[in-house]
Amino acid sequence: MIESKEVFEAFQEHRGDAIVSVQGTSGRHWADVTTNQNRDISMGGAMGQSTAAIFGLALGLPNEKVVHFDTEGALLMNLGVLASIAGKKPTNFVHFLLDNECYATTGGQPVPNSEEIDYSVIAAGSGYAATYNFDDLEEFSTSLDEIMNQDGPVFVAIKVPAEVENLPIGMRERRTSRSRGQTISDLRAELDIS
Amino acid sequence: MTWAQTIVDALKEHEISLIAYVPDSSIHQVTKIVDKDEYFHLVSATREEEALGIAAGAYATGRNAAVFMQSSGFGNSINAVAGLAIPSRIPIPIFINLRGEHGEFNIAQVTMGRSTRPILDVLGIPHYTLDSEERLEEKVNGALKLCYASREPLALCMTPLLHGGKNV
């Protein structure tokens, strides 16, 4: 396994100008690592929708690198999106999957068949241009240059530890964050889209 | 001009260049025109809520996007509208082929077809029914203009009286 925060720290070194979206409990670490918030976009919240939304974003911005850090719980809700993505072959799309094998935000209940699913095989079978599977930080770090510099869609599955929250939702500490609408406006301003 | 061509022309009029859809025999009359026209980017989705997600992402990049689906598929995608499009203020024209209307042969389509417009009402989504070619251009153009002015999703429900439906 690789700590989610370490995944993001390694990725940040190779981000370049990529537009970055994160999802789920693991994705929250990105806020502490990112250095270009105007190119971060939030399509989370509606679980199961964000993969398709970032796919749509990649189609709309064919000249920008678009990176999505998905989670296995969200992806499983709409697994068919892998076929839709592979069918359109967005060469600018890099799809990471941080797999913590559970629904961490609701208390750590396992996703179905949590320990045995190989998501990179599902992505490969769907027709992604390249797929990877990492369990080791060093191996991941040394592969990032290749991952970020090849034609997509690329899929990268990484096992991460679950960061389970057991506090009732109302008692959890909330980070201040931009609303989804605000991240869309900020990105559009950054890209000079009227 | 056919009803489908009228809709395609209205899409262009409003610079809607990305169409995400789940196929249906009536919708095919529109998507087959779209597919041959280089102005459009036609994206096939495996499920209707996915089509809404794709349209939301495209809108974030400054590209207007519409979705096409059956009423049964609208049933699949209610939370994509309620949880993504509405709170993010993303205008998405949703073209719904309203099944369960005149001439319906499939019992599985009846309940969701009948429930679609009441559900749209409860969600607070404006919707208009397209059931003839009379004033069609005016209705579609007016609805699309409203959709972008209000920055909210809007539905256009197409019935068999418009497109002839499906017989088998």
Protein language model annotation of sequence segments:
Chain B
Residues 1-168:
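Thiamine diphosphate
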